[in-house]
Each structure stands twice: as structure tokens, then as C-alpha cells.
């Protein structure tokens, strides 16, 4: 379903239904060793555990990928500059939320500098623990073979 006010995609399926259908190809890709997965700007309460948080900024979605699906590679956000997402939160808020949630990389097609500064400010203030960045950098370096 699409929210007519924001344009955000809402998935209302039960988790067991998603695991039996939509998520099958992701599980196969993970088992085959795919190095990265993009987390969409889609609201899926059965995965995130939250009514209004998109998967791209959700700690619940990161936890699901890491623990339930066993994925240890890079989790990359969908475009945080996306107009429908930015009707729900600002790009900078989304960037901070995504890093706090445990995303490895942020996809920002426009306005990168502002989002960078928002994340930097959140790290400097302690809102984002340095361990979150260390984890992301570690995953990136591992993926690069460094």
C-alpha cells in the first residue's frame, strides 16, 4: 500500500508471510554470500516493530537482518534524499537515525554535506556512539578485503 499523503510504501504483510515469499530471494542471496543489501524506504511494521519507521532507518530491521537472516555484510540505506521519505523526516534526521540503527553505509544522492554534518554533530554529542561507526567501517573494510 502507498500512503497518499507521503508517497511512502507500507507493507502490511505478516512476517511469516514475508518469510515464505518476498524474503526467500534475500535469504538465498545471503546464503550465496552477497556482500551488501540495500534497505528500502518502506515501512514494514512486522520487520521493524515500529509503526512509522522505514526499514532504511530502523534498528529493528537491522536486527532482523543480522540475527534472523544471519547477514553480516554491508547494510546500505535506500536514498535518504527520496522525496517520500523526506515528507516523514528530514534527510538529516534520516541520516542520523540510519547510523544509530546500525546501517553500514548511507545513500544520499543530494545534500550530502548537510547529512554528513548532521551525523558528525550526532557523533560529537554522543547521540551516536563511536562503536556504531567502528562497526560500519569494519564491515566496509572486510568487504573490500582490507
Residue ranges: model-predicted function:
Residues 1-121, 127-131, 139:
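Second-shell residues forming the walls of enzyme active-site clefts
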